[in-house]
């Protein structure tokens, strides 16, 4: 983008399939990522001028019209999380080397479609919008937890974004509106809520119960 004008440059790389997700590192935008309909993952370190396909890895497929998701880390260059269809394979994978290799990041999340991902500014919590509800992942506990509680609608959650100004993960649902999951806007209750000496997803679950009453 130059001023009020947006310039478009078409790349000439042939991915041999439909692109279902794209992303780039917010730390270094020259690192770009792409996921195809067949689950092939590609990464580039030179602004997309050349691409490398992850060897020996088939990632999650995508929803037939919605696509998949790539979430590059905001704090760790090379860390990339991808998500999509998880009925015959894990729905979420993570890489620490730009996609050179991946491992499953699906402990605690059911076999389902993951439509969208979002993270806090420090990446300590990852949020997932899925076909069966809203989930959160703590880097301390390393497990996904259902965060719908008793108030969240039992519905498909299509989108999620993290709104740092109000410490909230904002989810969009199918026909049931937009729901904010507030992490913390009061320093008095930040941190180790259950006093087990560890700040993890259990503290997050307690916090949402406090908010919902």
Question: Would you name each region that the model predicts?
Answer:
Residues 193-213:
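Alpha-helical segments with a strong preference for the paired helices of cellulosomal dockerin domains
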Residues 77, 188-190, 202:
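Surface-exposed or flexible loop/turn and strand-edge residues in extracellular/cell-surface modules
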Residues 1-186:
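Extracellular glycan-interacting surfaces
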Residues 105, 189, 208:
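Glycine-rich, flexible loop/turn motifs
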């Amino acid at each position: 983008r130059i001023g009020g004008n947006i310039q478009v440059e078409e790349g000439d790389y042939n991915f041999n399939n439909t692109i279902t997700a794209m992303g780039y590192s917010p730390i270094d935008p020259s690192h770009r990522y792409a996921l195809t309909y067949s689950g092939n993952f590609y990464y580039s370190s030179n602004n997309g001028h050349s691409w490398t396909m992850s060897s020996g890895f088939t990632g999650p497929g995508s929803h037939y019209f919605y696509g998949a998701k790539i979430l590059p880390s905001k704090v760790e260059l090379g860390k990339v999380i991808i998500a999509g269809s998880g009925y015959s394979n894990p729905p979420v994978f993570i890489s620490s080397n730009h996609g050179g290799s991946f491992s499953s990041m699906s402990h605690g999340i059911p076999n389902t479609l993951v439509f969208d991902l979002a993270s806090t500014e420090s990446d300590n919590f990852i949020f997932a919008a899925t076909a069966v509800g809203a989930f959160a992942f703590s880097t301390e506990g390393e497990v996904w937890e259902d965060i719908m509680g008793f108030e969240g609608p039992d519905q498909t959650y299509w989108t999620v974004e993290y709104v740092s100004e109000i410490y909230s993960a904002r989810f969009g649902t199918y026909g049931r509106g937009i729901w904010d999951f507030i992490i913390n806007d009061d320093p008095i209750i930040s941190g180790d809520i259950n006093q087990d000496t560890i700040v993890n997803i259990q503290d997050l679950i307690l916090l949402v119960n406090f908010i919902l009453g």
